[in-house]
Design a protein with these regions (language model features):
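Short, acidic Ser/Thr/Gly-rich low-complexity loop/linker segments typical of extracellular
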Residues: 46-62
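Membrane-proximal, glycine/serine-rich, low-complexity loop/turn segments characteristic
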Residues: 60-62, 76, 83, 90, ...
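Outer membrane beta-barrel strand-and-loop segments of large Gram-negative receptors
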Residues: 378, 512-514, 558-565, 665, ...
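Structural motif
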Residues: 26-36
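Outer-membrane beta-barrel translocator domains and adjoining extracellular loop/strand segments
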Residues: 211-212, 277-282, 357-373, 382, ...
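Signature of Gram-negative outer-membrane beta-barrel scaffolds
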Residues: 528-633, 812-813, 822
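A short, solvent-exposed loop/turn motif at the edges and junctions
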Residues: 47-50, 72, 76-88
Length: 961
């Protein structure tokens, strides 16, 4: 069947109509005859019997429409800063070359008139667009500072961006990658003064952009559209500061823009938890905690403060990091257009961090209906981490209907860590059950390699296309863990002490290959059919060898078979499906079904040989509806089902004895999960009043949800020949359970307050999570409810007066079926004000004051504290390019970091060591040189629509949506 389908598709390619008429031309500036790139060209049939052809001029000003039927047409050209151009043309039975078309600047541009009628936000199809000019900021503000003022967009203290209730995973600049997928690096290193627009949208996968069909691989994304007159020039800043307690911070960023060619450099070194980038954790070792006391999920609140200065070192962010870090980082980003057909971008990034932390944990473990156990832990840790990552993307447009896209990512990580832990297990926080003291020294390294090769072809017939993608993913992790532990167990009449001294050698590998063949065919004037075939092949291995210390030989040479395991796993899928779509640019619905056959094979080759082979047949559905309710509002509804296999570490049946009060193991009998997701989005934008409303609903269920089964020993039990589960100790393993539900809502309303020249954003939400679990073979359901409300008032006065007031409150209600009378309600609230006042002579004064309050946590964790950061400085040198700033962090010496984590088996409160008061003197020098830009702002913003409305697939092969 598949061979027939492939033969049919390539047969259609060969015998496609090759005699279609084309219309081409070259746009140029009427005054200096330079190419006009990024302009929007529309070709409309005079009798309106066809949907219009739309494309965008390339960097050489040229454009082409293919397969244009004979008839009379109107050619329209629009571009920001230029007068509209319209010309009537007649298409006969041959190709038409319109030659050079001169476009004159608009009268407003020639007279240098500033137009102030722009609106804060507007909806453009599936894209929400904010006008940067409508948000007044200080001259040294970054892209992150800008988006914080926009309704529906939030940035937490660690730099994570949320838009319309979803985490932003990618930020591009003029449609081009900037440091790969590192949204933090883009927003914190790009000055706000070069930004013209911020576009928020759901980015389809590269393959789905050809067809417009959502394949489930969408990511919430932001595209930054730069100002046309700032696309040729150099800009950036360098800074260096030194303070009390030997605190230091130095670094900078510089960008060289020459239209399509762009080179950016960033560098950073400090010991004040400043991180202007995101760090990838391939090894799973740099996140907080998880030393064996059980995995931790969720958590919120707390923080190390957030202080935004006015100079080059203005990213004073500590955020949710655990501990105090010394950081060194360097990165380079390159993007360019190699001729007319090749767009390329690439980046290299290195970072090294040395993090020290002192952590306290207070945990309540649910045991039975009437009893709980309590675990208290103190730990000291040091973590040295090294990351190298390379990203590369090449888009080769063979012609207007064919392209090849190559995307590559390579990441390396090396991590060395030391953890010293002291833990006590008790009954009712009085009667001691056991205690442990252990240290773990770990040396881990790994790499990941991801590569995608995608061929896309748009046929002359609009709506007919074919694409073939090939993906490879390689992941490798190796590590050595040295454990020294002493455990004490309190029995009724005796005290038992044991010691452990061992080395664990771990190796994990995963290789995955996948293909994706997609064919689309128009059905009538408004409908389209998609057929896809997607096989994938994944092979994983996990080897763990544990050696006890041999005192006689003075080395780790005694193999412990109870703690050693060699495990292989394969997961292969065959997926084929069909989707039907009907609609136009305003309204569209689609529905599809696919059949997936999956095989999950697990082979244990040591210490015993076992084989498990599972196969699954699933029907997966998808549906989408986009409705334009009015000129100001629209509604989108998305449904998709999917299946996901368990990881090889979840499957491997080997005991982890790092914390011998809490053992964990894998489960080779795990099944794949089946997930249903529904997303509803309502958007209302009133451009005339600059008002906006966003309301989102998310709902998901999971069958065979991978949860945890936790067993607390009521008496000593043997897990193996060398592992004893003592009374009061726990063993946890993953199991499949039904009943998982997650639901959440997000609402925000933005409006201007003209009488104080400010913007007010209200937000509210409700979330619910149902987590099933097993406690001593008894079902326990954790029901978590969260209610949140917040408001942000941000100034929009001038660059000399910038302030933001914010407030947020969270009420959390957690109930467990095993202990329904247990009160786990807690409340957190945060209020803050930031001010930045600047005089025309360069004197500035800044404040960042916040209050954090926690109620309902365990004793010692209920806190109410203030974090006050302040700075005063003077700008000097020509054009105020230099700056000297004196700042203080945590003026009141009250900074803290507190989180609460809730799972199906326990609730815990965590306190981490944080950065506290220091003073710093910082010098900053600003770089800024701009030439004449030649790229239209309005045109380049359409770059991200490649495969939708713009080049190269905006021609005959595209379905007009």
């Amino acid at each position: 069947m598949y061979k027939i389908l492939i033969s049919f598709l390539f047969g259609v390619m060969i015998f496609a109509n090759v005699n279609a008429q084309s219309v081409s031309g070259i746009l140029q500036d009427a005054s200096d005859k330079t190419p006009l790139s990024g302009a929007t060209i529309k070709l409309s049939k005079s009798d309106a019997t066809l949907n219009p052809f739309i494309t965008v001029s390339n960097s050489h000003g040229s454009f082409t429409f293919r397969n244009v039927p004979e008839g009379n047409y109107a050619l329209t050209v629009t571009s920001v800063g230029y007068a509209s151009f319209k010309k009537d043309i007649q298409i006969t039975g041959k190709n038409s070359n319109l030659g050079d078309i001169s476009i004159s600047k608009s009268a407003e541009t020639l007279a240098t008139v500033t137009i102030n009628s722009a609106t804060n936000v507007r909806q453009k199809n599936d894209t929400l667009e904010y006008a940067a000019s409508q948000y007044k900021l200080n001259p040294d503000a970054t892209g992150e500072d800008l988006i914080k003022k926009m309704p529906g967009v939030t940035v937490d203290k660690s730099g994570a961006v949320t838009a319309q209730g979803e985490t932003v995973q990618k930020v591009t600049v003029d449609g081009r990658d900037f440091f790969g997928d590192d949204a933090t690096a883009t927003l914190r290193n790009l000055p706000s003064e070069v930004i013209d627009k911020i576009q928020v949208f759901d980015k389809l996968s590269d393959q789905a952009q050809l067809t417009g069909f959502d394949d489930g691989n969408t990511t919430k994304s932001i595209n930054i559209v730069t100002k046309a007159d700032m696309r040729t020039g150099n800009f950036g800043r360098v800074f260096a500061g030194y303070g009390t307690d030997d605190r230091y911070s130095a670094g900078g960023n510089v960008s060289f823009f020459n239209n399509a060619r762009r080179i950016s450099l960033i560098g950073l070194t400090n010991n004040v938890n400043q991180q202007n980038f995101s760090s990838q954790d391939l090894l799973g070792v740099t996140s907080s905690g998880n030393r064996g006391g059980g995995g931790r999920r969720g958590g919120g609140g707390g923080g190390g403060g957030n202080f935004r200065g006015g100079g080059g070192g203005n990213n004073f962010s500590v955020g949710q990091q655990s501990g105090i870090a010394k950081t060194n980082a360097f990165g380079i980003n390159y993007s360019d257009a190699w001729g007319k057909k090749i767009d390329v971008s690439g980046s290299y990034f290195f970072n090294n961090s040395n993090t020290s932390n002192d952590q306290t944990i207070n945990r309540q473990n649910f045991i039975t209906k009437d009893s709980s156990q309590y675990y208290d832990e103190n730990s000291i840790s040091n973590n040295q981490n090294y990351n190298n990552r390379v990203n590369f993307r090449l888009d080769y447009k063979i012609d207007s209907n064919n392209s090849i896209l190559i995307t590559t990512g390579l990441n390396f990580q090396n991590n060395n860590s030391t953890n010293l832990v002291s833990g006590v297990n008790s009954l009712n926080q009085q009667n001691l059950l056991s205690q442990t003291e252990y240290d773990i020294n770990s040396n881990n390294k790994g790499y990941s390699f991801n590569n995608e090769i995608l061929f896309r072809h748009a046929f002359p017939k609009r709506g007919r296309s074919v694409s073939l993608g090939f993906n490879t993913n390689f992941n490798n992790r190796n590590g050595e863990n040295f454990l020294n532990a002493q455990n004490i167990y309190y029995k009724s009449a005796t005290v038992i002490t044991d010691t452990t001294q061992q080395l664990s050698d771990q190796k994990n590998n995963t290789n995955r290959y996948s293909f994706n063949l997609v064919y689309t065919e128009p059905v009538g004037k408004r409908a389209q059919l998609q057929i896809n075939y997607n096989p994938s092949f994944q092979k994983s291995s996990a080897d763990q060898e544990t050696f006890n210390y041999d005192n006689t030989a003075s080395k780790y040479s005694l193999l412990d078979t109870s703690l050693s395991n060699k495990f292989d796993n394969t997961y292969n899928t065959q997926n084929t499906g069909i989707t039907y779509r009907l609609g136009d640019r305003n309204n569209m619905i689609s529905a599809g079904l696919s059949y997936q056959y999956s095989e999950l094979k697990s082979d244990q080759v040591f210490p015993q040989v076992t084989y498990i082979n599972n196969s699954y047949s699933n029907i997966l559905a998808n549906a989408f509806a986009r409705l334009k309710l009015s000129s100001k509002s629209n509604l989108r509804v998305i449904y998709r089902s999917s299946v996901n296999p368990p990881s090889v570490t979840q499957l491997q049946n080997v005991i982890n004895n790092s914390n011998q009060l809490f053992y964990t193991t894998g489960n080779p009998d795990l099944q794949q999960q089946y997930t249903n997701n529904i997303i509803t989005r309502y958007t209302y934008t009133n451009s005339a009043k600059s008002q906006s409303i966003f309301a989102n609903l998310y709902f998901s269920t999971i069958n065979n949800y991978v949860s945890n089964a936790t067993y607390t020993a009521s008496k000593d039990s043997a897990l193996s020949s060398s592992v004893i589960l003592h009374k009061g100790s726990q063993l946890s393993k993953p199991v499949n359970l039904n009943g998982y539900i997650s639901a959440r809502s997000f609402f925000t309303f933005g409006m201007p307050l003209k009488f104080i020249k400010s913007n007010l954003n209200w937000n509210a939400g409700v979330s619910y999570a149902k987590l099933p679990g097993l406690l001593n073979n008894i079902s326990n359901i954790s029901n978590s409810y969260n209610y949140n409300l917040g408001a942000v008032l941000s100034s929009n006065i001038s660059e000399y007066v910038d302030f933001t007031l914010s407030y947020s409150a969270n009420i959390n209600d957690v109930k467990n079926t095993i202990q329904p009378l247990l009160n786990n309600n807690y409340f957190t609230q945060s209020a803050g004000i930031t001010t930045n006042f600047l005089t025309k002579k360069g004197l500035f004064f800044q404040n960042d004051i916040s209050n954090q309050s926690y109620k309902g946590l365990t004793d010692g964790f209920n806190q109410d504290y203030w974090l006050w950061n302040m700075a005063i400085g003077q700008k000097f040198l020509k054009n105020q390019m230099g700056e000297l700033k004196l700042s203080v962090f945590d003026l009141l010496k009250q900074n803290k970091s507190i989180t609460r984590d809730v799972t199906e088996s326990y609730v815990q409160d965590v306190r981490n060591h944080v950065l506290q008061q220091y003073f710093m003197l910082t010098f900053t020098y600003k770089l800024k040189t701009f030439g004449k830009g030649r790229v239209s702002s309005e045109g380049r913003e359409n770059r991200r629509f490649e495969g939708r409305d713009g080049q190269p697939f905006g021609g005959p092969g595209r379905f007009p949506l």
